[in-house]
Amino acid sequence: MSIPADRRTFLAATAAGVLGLSARGQVHAEQAATETAQPTSPPFSLGTVTYNIAAEWDLDTILRVLPKVGLTHVEFRTTHKHGVEPTLSKEQRQEIKKRCADAGVTIWGLGSVCEFHSPDPKVVDGHIETCKQFLQLAHDIGAKGVKVRPNGLRKDVPEAETIAQIGKALIPCGEAAANLGTEVWVEVHGSETSKPSRMKAIMEACGHKNVGICWNSNPSDVVDGSIKPSFEMLAPWIKSCHINALYSGYPYRELFSELRRINYDRVTLIELGEKLDPQNGELLLKYYRKLWQELCS
């Protein structure tokens, strides 16, 4: 049976329209898929610890180099050339705060060497007081927190006793931090104390909301090629994060994925053992940032 010309025209136009819509729909779907696949910027930032790459840079050099290489945050490690120490006067603290702000560099934290495992109570009390001094400095210059560290287990008492001692010593530090609007970050540190299960026990022994963990990207984090078991164990307390040589074989892509998963929106801080002059340091940091961006994607 022949189809009238007007009906043939209608069917042809309808078919063309359907094909056109289908094609456009396919293009839109492909565009949406492409857009979905595009890597998004991580919620966390990249900064550096002055240990050890900038250990011999003065404050002027730090504030010149970091913005040039695209780093936004710094953790000032004690004893380094920058001179950011609890001995600073009120006026000097205000000046440092202003200079960093003017340079666009956020003072993320202060790296102390306070530790709390000594068998001598007076030594422990001294470290607590030093931590409080650093917390006051952090408050005065606008830093978020102070890094401390466990650095060993006593040999004269059971392990659990040393862990309880460290946790208990952190409580007055946390109380001081709360009063100042700052935090205490316990670095996953020490040949014995860096074991994630021991760090978890220290956090539980402390139990103060202003005391958390500074993830330290240690080889001991890795279990059967993955950091996931260690990360999940410590995730509730992670408040800061140190990262090291990105070529080391440590599963950094997995770490950054895990940080995304817990909505970590703070800072990952470069911590390298080598001391470099500003020219070579600037070059290294540029390459480091590019590789960090790729691993975060």
Q: Could you tell me what each predicted segment is?
A:
Residues 14-22, 33-40, 60-67, 97-109, ...:
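Active-site acidic/histidine proton-transfer and metal-coordination neighborhood
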